[in-house]
Amino acid sequence: MSYSLGITLTFELLKFKTEYVNRVYVHSAMKQGDTLDKLLKLCKDSDIEVVYVDKIFNVLSQKENCYVIGEFRKFESKLDKESSHIVLVNPSNAGNMGTIMRSALGFGMNRMAIIRPAVDAFDPKVVRASMGAIFSTEFVYFDSFDEYMKEYGDRELYPFMLDAKMKLHDVSPRDKFSLIFGNEATGLPHEFSNIGQSVIIPHSARIDSLNLPIAASIAMYEATKADF
């Protein structure tokens, strides 16, 4: 079970994953008006229960202006073998994962492989940070990178590493590809330098590295800019 915290996220949930919605909670402080009327109509049309209760908001949300919560069942996805992927190896931060999902949807790369151990994509913090992009993202968990490779390895592979020799602006993916990123704290293990073509995003010496969502977003932009 998971939750969409806030009316904007809940509208996205109702739009893209209606069949997985159990119920919608509405706080007593939610103002009457067109927005609430629209929400109630969507729920009625899809036969979704609306529950007026305040207590659950105290448990699930620390934001004072959260007046709508959608409760939904976890859903399964499949990765398209003919599409390009984002691969996150051992991501541990919920906010980062959600932010990457949002960028991936924006750049048309909303297919994500997640290598365990990893944060739960259905953590409400991921859902919130994704701004609803999770409901339009294909994502699959794998117990190891080798498991991912066995099923989806027939593609161009680009692990992003600080000791890589090739700079991002010199990379020109020609076919389906995977952009591979490591854990926020440790990056990718050294053995990934032997997989595909390792890549570095050049930046000034004033910083040690870019944070994960920024690096992933820059990489996705460069890889897909010809499409827009």
Q: Which residue stretches match the model-derived regions?
A:
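Amphipathic alpha-helical repeat scaffolds
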Residues: 6, 92-100, 210-215
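Short, structured interface segments
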Residues: 67-77
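RNA substrate-binding interface of SAM-dependent RNA methyltransferases
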Residues: 22, 26, 76-164
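N-terminal positively charged helical leader segments and presequences
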Residues: 1-69
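Active-site/ligand-binding-proximal alpha/beta "capping" segment
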Residues: 160-208
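Structured adenosyl-cofactor binding patch, chiefly the S-adenosyl-L-methionine
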Residues: 22, 70, 105-107, 121-135, ...
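Short, glycine/polar-rich helix-capping loops at beta-to-alpha or helix-loop-helix junctions
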Residues: 36-39, 119-126, 186-191
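Short beta->alpha connector loops at strand-helix junctions that form conserved
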Residues: 53-54, 89, 115-116, 138, ...
